[in-house]
């Protein structure tokens, strides 16, 4: 006897349809699984036998051959357990319904319970594209998958529930579509920040255009404090951004099962002890790293020179492309990483280099070695560099509150609305992602701005990349002012935001 049942596979974020073909024939009892499955797939035989025997179904006396098609694609993990069990139930006529429009996903325990499975939303989206109408999966994953429109999702707690459902004894109702809503959450407010007007303005520009930022200054000037308040001025996530981010967090097993859709932009603060694998992802089965977990949000690297230089160098390509590709023998996996990189650092090991209120105890060689841990190509990818000086006693002791995040966010939202209209019909989401081919069209300058940028290019020895990034930051400054064209003052602001590489790292970019 022959039967086939649909399932879904996953490698990285790449979901694909899998067909479990099963043949029950006469002969020496056996249970074989073919189709390029890994060790976890082969071990599923014991889980499946145990789960079925627990409800009085024995496969020990049968000769079963299961093929997971397509046979040339590597199958990794335990999520095929439920697919194979459904195929066994179908070939033994325990389930007699037409299953051609159904798909079954999930790991099954020895007791027959379905286990929470990561990466469900990616597989649910692909299942719909493949024409699947009904999706059966672990009950704990049902809410996550139900966000996909046009797909009936059935949460199954135990394989006996599946049998009773198709037998008509106890029908399972489809999971109601989950409609995510923007969460109201407590964030630290910019009004807590004393002084630092330039840094506040820099973060406003950065949040409006999704630009990368470097904060540099002596210890105790509030670099980390102000960075941690960035989430309070970031625009809400769109639905598409939310689904993208949820897919990554689902694979990483980081979703809240009660609120399985990420609706708040991530803020990932990474320790300087992080490895390259921890930062960009990796492993035998590639998992997303911190840069991908921060997708559509903020990646914060404090004490930047304390990171291993080789680790920082791995950021160069993903910062440029917005995607990280990890290659393994069984294939390549790509994870999106469209992030706002925020970094903070002291200007030297003791922290007082260039500080008029403190004495630097570092030698010139120590300072050069410290700053040299950040390569010029990495520095060139940071659009906005801002110095945070030590505060005066009057600034620290003042009871006056700074401008609240809500007022700053209001201006940022207006700038983002301008960008949305500008980028309508394209895949561009923010000024920082304008490709070179669109720069001339989307960043028009008046004559004064052109002349100033030309002068700066010659005097500062700017690279082509730095030129592009200055233009993008100037575009954001103009948007915040409501100007359609980039003016001289916008170029001036953007150039000033790149002046620290001359002060601390020598010649400009």
Role assignments for model-derived ranges:
Residues 296, 302-303, 314:
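Walker B catalytic acidic pair
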Residues 241-275, 282-283, 389, 429-438, ...:
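Conserved inter-motif catalytic segment of the P-loop NTP-binding fold
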Residues 1-214, 218-224, 327, 466-467, ...:
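Peripheral, non-AAA+ core regions of ATP-driven protein-machinery
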Residues 204, 260-261, 266, 276-299, ...:
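Conserved alpha-helical scaffold flanking the Walker A/P-loop in AAA+ ATPase domains
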Residues 18-24, 279, 383-386:
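Short beta-strand elements
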Residues 34-45, 60, 67-77, 285-286, ...:
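Basic, amphipathic alpha-helical bundle interface domains used for macromolecular binding and assembly
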Residues 110, 299-300, 306-307:
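Residues immediately C-terminal
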Residues 215-256:
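Walker A/P-loop
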């Amino acid at each position: 006897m022959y039967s086939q049942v649909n399932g879904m596979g996953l490698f990285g974020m790449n979901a694909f349809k899998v067909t479990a073909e099963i043949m029950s024939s006469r002969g020496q009892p056996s249970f074989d699984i073919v189709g390029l499955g890994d060790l976890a797939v082969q071990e599923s035989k014991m889980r499946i036998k145990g789960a079925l025997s627990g409800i009085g179904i024995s496969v020990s006396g049968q000769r079963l051959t299961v093929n997971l098609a397509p046979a040339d694609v590597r199958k990794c993990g335990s999520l095929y357990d439920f697919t194979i069990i459904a195929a066994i139930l179908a070939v033994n006529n325990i389930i007699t319904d037409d299953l051609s429009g159904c798909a079954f996903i999930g790991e099954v325990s020895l007791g027959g319970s379905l286990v929470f499975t990561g990466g469900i939303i990616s597989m649910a989206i692909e299942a719909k594209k493949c024409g699947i109408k009904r999706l059966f999966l672990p009950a704990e994953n049902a809410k996550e998958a139900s966000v996909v429109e046009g797909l009936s999702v059935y949460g199954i707690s135990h394989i006996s529930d599946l049998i009773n459902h198709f037998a008509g004894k106890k029908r399972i109702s489809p999971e109601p579509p989950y409609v995510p809503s923007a969460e109201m959450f407590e964030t630290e407010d910019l009004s807590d920040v004393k002084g630092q007007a330039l840094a506040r303005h820099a973060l406003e520009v950065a949040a409006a255009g999704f630009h990368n930022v470097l904060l540099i200054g002596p210890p105790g000037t509030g670099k980390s404090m102000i960075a941690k308040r960035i989430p309070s001025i970031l625009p809400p996530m769109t639905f598409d951004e939310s689904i993208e981010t949820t897919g990554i967090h689902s694979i990483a097993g980081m979703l809240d099962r009660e609120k399985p859709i990420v609706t708040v932009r991530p803020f990932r603060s990474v320790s300087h002890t992080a490895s390259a694998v921890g930062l960009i992802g990796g492993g035998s089965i590639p998992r997303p790293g911190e840069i991908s977990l921060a997708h559509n949000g903020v990646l914060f690297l404090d004490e930047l020179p304390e990171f291993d230089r080789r680790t920082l160098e791995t950021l160069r390509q993903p910062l440029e492309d917005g995607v990280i590709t990890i290659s393994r023998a069984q294939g390549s996996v790509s994870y999106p990483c469209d992030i706002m990189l925020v970094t903070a650092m002291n200007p030297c090991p003791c922290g007082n280099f260039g500080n008029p209120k403190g004495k630097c105890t570092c030698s010139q060689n120590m300072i050069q070695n410290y700053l040299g841990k950040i390569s010029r190509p990495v520095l060139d990818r940071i659009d906005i560099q801002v110095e945070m000086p030590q505060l005066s006693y009057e600034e620290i002791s003042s009871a006056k509150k700074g401008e609240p995040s809500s007022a700053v966010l209001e201006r940022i939202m207006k700038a983002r609305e301008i960008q949305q209209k500008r980028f309508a019909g394209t895949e561009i989401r923010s000024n920082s992602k304008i490709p070179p081919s669109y720069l001339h069209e989307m960043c028009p300058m008046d004559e004064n701005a052109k002349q100033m940028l030309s002068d700066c290019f010659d005097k500062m020895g700017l690279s082509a990349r730095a030129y592009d990034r200055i233009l993008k930051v100037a575009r954001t400054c103009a948007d915040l002012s409501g100007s359609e064209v980039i003016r001289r003052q916008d170029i001036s602001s953007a150039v000033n935001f790149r002046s620290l590489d001359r002060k601390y790292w020598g010649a400009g970019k």
